[in-house]
Amino acid sequence: MDFLLFLFCLNLFIHLFDKYVKTFLVNQGFRVYARFSGSPEFKSYNDLRLQLLSTKRDLNNVSAQDEFAKWARLNRKFDQLNVKWEKQSKIVSQKSEGVKKLISLTFWIVTRGYRFIVQFKNSGNPVFAVPEGMLPTWALWFLALPKAKTGYVSVAVWNFASQKVISTLL
Amino acid sequence: MSLEPLPGTLENLLEQTSLKWIFVGGKGGVGKTTTSCSLAIQMSKVRKSVLLISTDPAHNLSDAFGTKFGKEARLIPGFENLSAMEIDPNASIQEMLEQSEQQNPNNPMSGMMQDLAFAIPGIDEALAFAEVMKEVKSMNFDCVIFDTAPTGHTLRFLNFPTVLEKALAKLSGLTSRFGPLINQMSGMLGTNTNQEDIFAKMEGMRGSISEVNKQFKNPDLTTFVCVCISEFLSLYETERMIQELTSYEIDTHNIVVNQLLLDPDTKCPQCIARRKMQQKYLSQIEELYEDFHIVKVPQVPSEVRGTEALTKFSDLLIHPYVKE
C-alpha cells in the first residue's frame, strides 16, 4: 500500500513540477549561471542593459523643449545603445538556449529519470492484487505487463494509470 | 572643442562643383519648395544646366513659378539653364502597371506575378524613382535638385536596397525556374503568358536602383539640405531625419532655418514673444549641429511666389541677413 501511494505521489509531483515549477526554475538557474559564469557575452549584455536604463532615465529627466540639444544627444546615445543591445541580446539568446536546454535536461533526469529507474528496478514487483474473478484472464495478463505475476498490477501499469488520471484531472 | 561656427550660408553648395544631386527635405509647411526653388536659382548662376524636380504629389513648383510643369523637363520662363519637372511616384507606377495590362490583357498569370512582385514594401516608390533617375540621367543635367515630399518617403527605399535586391533576385530566380512550367500550363489553357517582360524590366530596375544608391552615398555627388523652422516639432523631425540620413550614409551638412524673426528691435508684443521662442530653439540648433552650416532665413512679409520674388528671396540663402 505504501508503495502504491509513493508511486502515485511521485507521479503527482512530476506532473505539478513540469507544469508549474520547471520553467521558473530553468529561468532562475539560467540567471544564476549568467551571473556567475563570467562569460563576456552575458557581462556586456548586462552592462548594456544597465547603460540603456540609465540613459533612458536621463532622457526622461531632460525636457526636450527646454534643452533640445542635450536631449537630442542623449537620444542619439540611446538609439546607439539600443542597436548594440539588440545585437547582443540576439547572441545571448542563442547561447542561453543551449544553457537552458542543459538545465532542463538535468531536471528531466532527476524527475522522470528517477521514475524510470524505480519502474525498471521494480518491474517484477506487484503493486496490488486484483480481486479474483473480477477481470478475464487476458485483461489480467495486460495489467501484469511487463514482468509482474498474473493477477497483480505492475508498476508500469500503475504509473501509466496514475499519470493518465492526474493529467486528466489537473 | 571650440570650433568657429561654419558660415551660415549655402555658398558651400555653390562652391562644391562635383555635386550632382541635391535633396531638399523637411516637414510640410516649413518652406521646402521656396528653399529648393531659391537654391535652384542660385545654382543656375554657377552651373551649366540645372534641373528642379518635385516628387511631392502636391506639386508646388507650378504654384511657385506660376507656370504649369509636367512630367517632362521644361525651361522655367526667365531662365536659360534652369528647368523644372513634377513627378508623382505613385502615378507613374500605376501607369507602368496599366501599360503591361494593356499589352497582354486577359492574362491571369501576369497579374498574379505582378501582385507578387509589388507586395514588396516600398518597391513602387523605388521603381518609380529608378525610372525617373534613368530619365534624368539621359537628359544630362549638370545638377539636379529634388524638392522631396514632406515625409521624405522618396528616400525611404534607400533603407532597403539590399532587401529589395534580394527579393528581386529571388523573384527572377523563381520565374526562370517555374517559367517554363507556367508557360506550358498556360499553353494548355490557351492563354498567352509573357510574364518575362515585367521581370526583365525589374532586372533592369535592379541595376539602376543599386547604381543610384551608390551615387547617393557618395558625399561628393550627393547632399541633403534639411529645411526646418525654429519650433520644437520641426526641430524634432529634423533631428530624426538627420539620424535617418546618417544611417543611410547620405551626406548632410546644411540646415536652413526658415521664417525667423531676426529684427532685434521689433516692437509688437507677439513678435517679441515669438522671437524669444525662436531664439531659444535656434541656440539649441547651433549647439547641437555645430558641424553644420546653419542658414538663418528671415520671415518675409509676403508670399514668395513668382520668379522675381524667388530670385530676390534666393539671395538670403547666400548672403546672411543684415538689418535694413
From Swiss-Prot, chain A:
Membrane topology (Lumenal): 1-3, 129-152
Keyword Lipid metabolism belongs to the record: no
UniProt-listed Pfam families: CHD5
GO MF annotation list: protein-membrane adaptor activity
Ranges in the topological domain labelled Cytoplasmic: 24-107, 170
Keyword Transmembrane assigned: yes
Sequence intervals crossing the membrane: 4-23, 108-128, 153-169
Keywords: Endoplasmic reticulum, Membrane, Transmembrane, Transmembrane helix, Transport
Localization in the cell: Endoplasmic reticulum membrane
Membrane topology annotation: Multi-pass membrane protein
GO biological process: tail-anchored membrane protein insertion into ER membrane
Gene Ontology cellular component terms for the protein in this record: endoplasmic reticulum membrane; GET complex
Family assignment from sequence similarity: Belongs to the WRB/GET1 family.
Chain's role: Required for the post-translational delivery of tail-anchored (TA) proteins to the endoplasmic reticulum. Acts as a membrane receptor for soluble get3, which recognizes and selectively binds the transmembrane domain of TA proteins in the cytosol.
HAMAP family: Get1
Assembly notes: Interacts with get3.
This protein's name: Protein get1
Gene (UniProt): get1
Curated annotation (Swiss-Prot), chain B:
Residues noted as binding Zn(2+) in the record, renumbered to the chain: C268, C271
Sorted UniProt keywords: ATP-binding, Cytoplasm, Endoplasmic reticulum, Hydrolase, Metal-binding, Nucleotide-binding, Transport, Zinc
Presence of the UniProt keyword Signal in the record: no
GO biological process, one term: tail-anchored membrane protein insertion into ER membrane
Cross-referenced CDD domains: ArsA (cd02035)
Gene Ontology molecular function terms on file: ATP binding; ATP hydrolysis activity; identical protein binding; metal ion binding
Residues annotated to bind ATP: K27, G28, G29, V30, G31, K32, T33, T34, E231, N258
Organism superkingdom: Eukaryota
One GO CC annotation: GET complex
Enzyme Commission no: 3.6.-.-
Protein localization: Cytoplasm; Endoplasmic reticulum
Active site positions: D56
InterPro entries tied to this protein: Anion-transp_ATPase-like_dom, ATPase_ArsA/GET3, ATPase_ArsA/GET3_euk, P-loop_NTPase
Membership in a protein family: Belongs to the arsA ATPase family.
HAMAP family per the UniProt record, alphabetical: Asna1_Get3
Subunit structure as annotated in this protein's UniProt entry: Homodimer.
Function description: ATPase required for the post-translational delivery of tail-anchored (TA) proteins to the endoplasmic reticulum. Recognizes and selectively binds the transmembrane domain of TA proteins in the cytosol. This complex then targets to the endoplasmic reticulum by membrane-bound receptors, where the tail-anchored protein is released for insertion. This process is regulated by ATP binding and hydrolysis. ATP binding drives the homodimer towards the closed dimer state, facilitating recognition of newly synthesized TA membrane proteins. ATP hydrolysis is required for insertion.
NCBIfam families per record: GET3_arsA_TRC40
Protein name, UniProt field: ATPase get3
Organism: Schizosaccharomyces japonicus (strain yFS275 / FY16936) (Fission yeast)
Gene behind the chain: get3
